[in-house]
Amino acid sequence: MKFRTWLFLFPLLCLPAWAAAVDYRLPPNATPAPPTEGVSAEIQEQLTAGQRVTRGGRVPFCDVWLARSWTTQADFQPTAAVIYPFEAGQFLGLVRYARKGTDYRGQEIPPGVYVMRYGLQPVDGNHVGTSVIRDFVLLTPADMDQTVAPIEEKALAKLSAQVAGGTHPTMLSLRHVPEDASALPALRHEEEGDLWILETAGQSAGGEALPVAVVLVGQAAE
């Protein structure tokens, strides 16, 4: 019996890593309506059309709605560490997880609806190695975050920690959108770290397109 079990398992154990990996997709023409339960009317009014990410092409994983427009810092110049012209605590959009996910630190994100706000990773010894880029999306419970107004950084960190139920904010890493990126939105896979990155575009308050890239699946290397 043990020998037969081994014969059954052997082909599975020999599969290459890519064969066992979960595939995520961005189905065309999937524009889910934003949720209303637990989401304030103020936030609902500020959302664009939704973008759905699925597992394996059919199973919903999460839906993302960007804000209609983003306030940006005047005369902002990106650096190697800070690439987006946002202010800490700024409202960026909304995300709904149909099933549990994980943030960039590996913390569990329960199914639910969360407000997306901009945050900057502190420059201190507690965050060495997490990411060279300090730009992050911090998630907050939608039923506890009812305004599009900015939130003070310490209050945001405390509120965001409630998503994962720990002491650290629940955070998704922001990345560069490649210069050769063609049509947006798109879902890009980075084999190193097995990251799935949503590349999409919002717009500034002045009407200029502002591409962004957020890691929806995957976490920092330990």
Segments (PLM) and residue ranges:
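Positively charged n-region of N-terminal signal peptides that target proteins for export
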Residues: 1-5
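Bacterial N-terminal signal peptides
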Residues: 7-16
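Primarily secretory-pathway and cell-envelope proteins
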Residues: 20-83, 139-222
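Extracytoplasmic
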Residues: 59, 90-92, 109-111, 132-134
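N-terminal post-signal-peptidase region of extra-cytosolic proteins
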Residues: 77-81, 91-100
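A short tyrosine-centered beta-strand micro-motif
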Residues: 112-119
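Short consensus segments that form the blades of beta-propeller domains
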Residues: 126-130
